[in-house]
């Protein structure tokens, strides 16, 4: 066993995964987490891998790229996916979790590993020696300044928004119905149907509602996958009807007809007492937010247990700075992982931590860091953030468009996606024991 210690900074999804992967390979880890000594604007607990946006890790089937990346991670013994599987709540074809149980489980697995030492303090300078930086989109100002100095260039920044959560008991169940879109999987969503008149009233209130003012020096750049609902609405009346409020596949069983618009609620905890409003990330002020949400049929008297909030995200220009091993180009023993690398999403962040952790462990053991081929989901993400055009670099979710092309063209989308998935999983099995 090597006597070298790897520093991991940040115990979010990526940092927790990186620490676990390093530790299970017989290498000592010093895991730094500034919470609860210093909180972020979006976190509420001192637990590892706290989910601050949705409680969904998105699709869990192999017909979707994020489902493939999950399966790759299962094969690679991901602590994040193991905990998610153990803490899952009903969500149709998606993998959603009880966020409190999930964070507690990840904390338990990582903290109790004999090779992990947890240090609760804020890191303001990049340590010497093998280090994985996984401080996430809410990196503290002091460390951000250090990273800016290290990279020699400005960060990009944008905002992610968290959706409101309501108590199930406060929902008028006579006005909503249980159904998944196109009846896929189990009926896991509560649906609030709207007539055109109800939608118009809601829409006008939404676009007129007061938002939390942003600081003057901060430019608004929103990532499409977690865009505030009021920003979507500002793009035009139909944006919501074709976006988070699209009614297709959600016929009202009482009428047999498709509503004009539908607001979906997804179970947020294992007990089924809390539901989040799908796609309704927002930074409306709390008073106006409550007024707007109570215009949704079934939510007229909704008890909001968590209002939607807004927080800043930060990411580096990875194509200029990183190798596909997640190593910093100018320093072999410095790794980056998580959303700050430009991977977007819970699962993608954890996947980057998995690969960064494996490679940090390999480096200190005198082994070559591994580059996963872009025929795999994890390899395609690493390839995207390091090989795409640096000038227009933007965060990206896992998707089949990032995969290396198939040898033979397949016209039908379902068959093509199946071929991508089969090839990816066949390939990743060659890396299970790295």
Curated annotation (Swiss-Prot):
Subcellular location: Cytoplasm
Primary localisation category: cytoplasm
Enzyme Commission identifier(s): 2.1.1.74
Broad class of enzyme this protein falls into: transferase
Any GO molecular function: tRNA (uracil(54)-C5)-methyltransferase activity, 5,10-methylenetetrahydrofolate-dependent
Cross-referenced Pfam families: GIDA
Cofactor requirements of the protein: FAD
Record keyword Calcium present: no
Gene Ontology cellular component terms for the protein in this record: cytosol
Name by which UniProt lists this protein: Methylenetetrahydrofolate--tRNA-(uracil-5-)-methyltransferase TrmFO
Gene Ontology biological process: tRNA methylation; tRNA wobble uridine modification
Function: Catalyzes the folate-dependent formation of 5-methyl-uridine at position 54 (M-5-U54) in all tRNAs.
Family as reported in the entry's similarity comment: Belongs to the MnmG family. TrmFO subfamily.
Coiled coil: none
Record field: catalytic activity: uridine(54) in tRNA + (6R)-5,10-methylene-5,6,7,8-tetrahydrofolate + NADH + H(+) = 5-methyluridine(54) in tRNA + (6S)-5,6,7,8-tetrahydrofolate + NAD(+); uridine(54) in tRNA + (6R)-5,10-methylene-5,6,7,8-tetrahydrofolate + NADPH + H(+) = 5-methyluridine(54) in tRNA + (6S)-5,6,7,8-tetrahydrofolate + NADP(+)
Designated gene of the protein: trmFO
Transmembrane segments: none
Binding positions (FAD): 10-15
Keywords noted in UniProt: Cytoplasm, FAD, Flavoprotein, Methyltransferase, NAD, NADP, Transferase, tRNA processing
